[in-house]
A protein has these predicted regions:
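Extracellular/periplasmic envelope-modification machinery, especially enzymes
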Residues: 3-7, 273, 338-348, 352-356, ...
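Membrane-interface helix/loop caps of multi-pass membrane proteins
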Residues: 2-401, 719
Length: 720
């Protein structure tokens, strides 16, 4: 993506009206400008560039072309690759600028981000400095409870990780191929065909992996070298076939170049963030880039080089590496710095600022390190510079981890809130189960109200702010909750598993988060509890698209059918439905819309028809942002993180759901009073942290509310 351009020497052939291009390729410098414009404007949210992320693919093909050509030329002339010189050149070119931006980004994160979020950024910085950031981001992408975290200012370093891993394996591949060829072919290893065959095999395997993983594990497909190597191999194949490209007549070469540029621009416009990627969709920008590079092997004024070689394009191309490094952290860190969300004008201003920083970095850091004569003469000095840059970045992030402490409450210890099961009060005209619900809710309301005005985060907060992100109920990690691509349901019964009374808790992650409360109730009442949950998959018959998978969520539809068949066979005494209310148009429906309300009524009616009592749990309050992160920045004023009730809860949506559940013959539990007072919704009750992230309750708060949950379940079962 960002290596020095070194062409492949070949004896030029003089043909009328065309000239084979040798040596430095100014058109590739201009092509870099196209790539960086696409990425930067896409991240800035400029309309019409929804697929601008393909700019990274353009960079990969360019890198594959330049590096493969350099290695092949050396191995065919010297029978080997001087690895010290090769890695020294890469270190000079890439690492000083990357380290400069990384250290500046980490320091800025320490200043403007909440401590809890900043510490995650420092860990991202360490992984990026060690060139494994792409795999850290891939792992975070497969963790459902981490997938809602705000993007990292280091996330764009994933492509540098891919490049560095490419540099680690590609020379060995070329050297190994040369060694084999030299022993099987008389006259040495000078012909390109064997190398092209090896690259073709590697590329085909990588493309197959990309197509498979894009559906099976999108984050790993996007971030990993095995699924991106084919893009680099495509550039390498162009380098190995350069003599054939140079023999093209002028007109076909120009058509290839313009067609390739059109493919790149078309994908920038037509692809969408939800397009499964890279998969086979990446073939378009990769093919387009290969055509531009291949067609550009012939000059004559007809190809896209007449645009790409213009001074302004070349100037942007020269600064593209530093601009790529700066643009993302500036875009992400500007809103918290200014204390307000950034609209399009502000984002465009941020891209200008990042461009200015890029120019400074190129002149002050990048070029001096790249072209310094002592470094160019000494591979050891170049490698030492690269090692220093890597160590400096990692050490800076480690140091910041010690400077920015693990956030903790330092207010007075708060008494633990308590909600207990009381003997039902004798209330005229009120049955005992209804009385128990009222008593439990009254205790919860009192606990919430008592905590509403507490400002300082208590020193005995449970779980602590540092522990909150890992406060996952067992169901989230033991395989009992189905992930995106999983169907069926593991046998994860709890409570008294031999009991004739079965309670089924069903839904998405918002059903799973209530599992600790229901488990406590099931153990007390000797019920058999079956929690049947699948991420972002409510048990409502609605066509659903997964923004994560970027396609129709067929696994959800299959799982729903399997669960309904299981319920019809088991006839549980009570079915509890719980689901997030954060579904929006990207899922092909939205929470509380008419289709949602109708589907809820039908689901309740269908479950009642199999003989089960049905309880629908209403929504929890929506804090809209990560509560632990917010509190880490407001340890002296927890009320700053408490959302207003009117924003956190849709009273109209709750009323519509309540009517739908009643129409289907079920019970509905409005949970608003368990989280909110009339004007706002506290995020700490007693000494218990309510939310572990931006929408899931902590295990501790779910268990605190177990008496309320038990009373609601008793009432639903008694009412049939």
């Amino acid at each position: 993506m960002t290596v020095r351009q070194e062409g492949i020497s070949s004896r030029p052939r003089q043909v009328e009206r065309r000239t084979p291009r040798t040596g430095f390729r100014p058109d590739i410098e201009g092509l870099r400008a196209v790539a960086v414009f696409a990425v930067v404007l896409y991240h800035a949210g400029v309309p019409g560039i929804a697929g601008g992320y393909v700019g990274v693919d353009v960079f990969f093909v360019i890198s594959g072309f330049l590096i493969t050509g350099l290695l092949w030329r050396e191995v065919t002339t010297a029978d080997t690759v001087r690895l010290g010189r090769f890695y020294g050149a890469r270190a000079r070119r890439l690492l000083p600028a990357a380290a400069t931006v990384a250290i500046a980004t980490a320091i800025a994160a320490a200043v403007v981000l909440p401590p809890l979020q900043a510490r995650r950024v420092f860990l991202d910085g360490i992984a990026s400095a060690l060139y494994v950031g792409n795999y850290r981001f891939a792992m975070q992408g497969t963790d459902y409870l981490a997938s809602d975290q705000p993007p990292s200012p280091f996330q764009h370093y994933w492509s540098l990780g891919v490049e560095e891993q490419f540099y680690a394996v590609w020379p060995a591949l070329i050297i190994g191929t040369g060694w084999l060829v030299s022993r099987t072919r008389r006259g040495g290893a000078s012909r390109a065909a064997p190398y092209a065959a090896v690259l073709g095999l590697v590329g085909a395997a990588s493309l197959a992996a990309a197509a498979l993983w894009t559906n099976a594990s999108p984050s790993w497909a996007f971030f990993s070298l095995p699924t991106r190597a084919w893009e680099l191999a495509a550039g390498g194949l162009v380098a190995l076939s350069i003599r054939q490209w140079r023999r093209l007549p002028l007109l076909p070469a120009a058509i290839a170049g313009w067609g390739g540029l059109a493919l790149i621009l078309l994908t920038c416009d037509q692809l969408r963030p939800g397009t499964p990627y890279p998969g086979v969709a990446a073939l378009l920008p990769v093919l387009g880039t290969a055509l531009v590079i291949g067609g550009g092997c012939v000059t004559g004024g007809m190809g896209p080089g007449r645009v790409l070689c213009r001074p302004v394009m070349r100037a942007v191309g020269r600064v593209s590496y530093s601009w790529y490094l700066w643009h993302w952290p500036v875009l992400l860190l500007m809103p918290p710095l200014l204390g307000a969300p950034a609209g399009l004008p502000a984002k465009l201003a941020a891209t200008v600022v990042s461009a200015g920083l890029a120019v400074i970095t190129m002149h002050v850091v990048e070029n001096p390190g790249r072209f310094a004569a002592p470094l160019r003469r000494s591979a050891k000095a170049s490698l030492a510079l690269g090692g220093f840059a890597t160590a400096a970045t990692a050490c800076a992030c480690v140091l910041l981890l010690t400077v920015v402490p693990v956030p903790a409450g330092h207010g007075a210890a708060a008494p633990a809130a308590k909600i207990v099961t009381l003997p039902p009060m004798a209330v005229p005209a009120v049955d005992p189960q209804e009385a128990a619900v009222r008593q439990a809710f009254a205790q919860a309301r009192d606990a919430v109200a008592a905590a509403a005005d507490r400002r300082a985060v208590p020193s005995n907060l449970n779980p602590s702010l540092a522990q909150a992100p890992a406060d996952k109920a067992a169901i989230f990690v033991n395989g009992c909750m189905r992930s995106w691509r999983e169907v069926g349901q593991s046998e994860c019964a709890k409570g008294d598993t031999a009991s004739p009374t079965t309670v089924a808790l069903i839904g998405d992650s918002h059903a799973a988060m209530w599992d600790p409360a229901f488990q406590q109730v099931a153990e007390q009442r000797h019920w058999r509890l079956e929690t049947l949950a699948k991420v972002t998959c409510p048990l409502l018959e609605l066509p659903i698209v997964s923004p994560y998978l970027g396609r129709e969520y067929t696994e959800c539809e299959t799982w729903r059918g399997q669960i309904m068949a299981r319920l019809k066979a088991e006839h549980p005494r009570l079915v509890v439905l719980s689901m997030s209310r954060r579904y929006h148009a990207d899922f092909s429906f939205a929470s509380y819309d008419p289709a949602w309300i109708d589907a809820l009524s039908r689901a309740v009616s269908q479950l009642r028809s199999i003989g089960s009592a049905v309880l629908v749990l209403g929504p929890v309050a929506d804090p809209e942002s990560s509560v632990p992160t917010c509190l880490s920045a407001h340890v002296d004023d927890a009320t700053a993180c408490a959302p207003t009730r009117s924003v956190a809860v849709s009273s109209g949506g709750v009323a519509a759901e309540q009517a739908a559940a009643a129409a289907g013959g079920g019970h509905y539990a409005d949970l608003t009073d368990l989280f909110c007072i009339p004007d706002r919704c506290p995020v700490i009750v007693g000494n218990t942290l309510v939310f572990r992230d931006d929408n899931h309750v902590t295990t501790e708060y779910a268990q605190l509310l177990a008496p309320v949950i038990g009373a609601l379940a008793d009432r639903a079962m008694a009412g049939g």
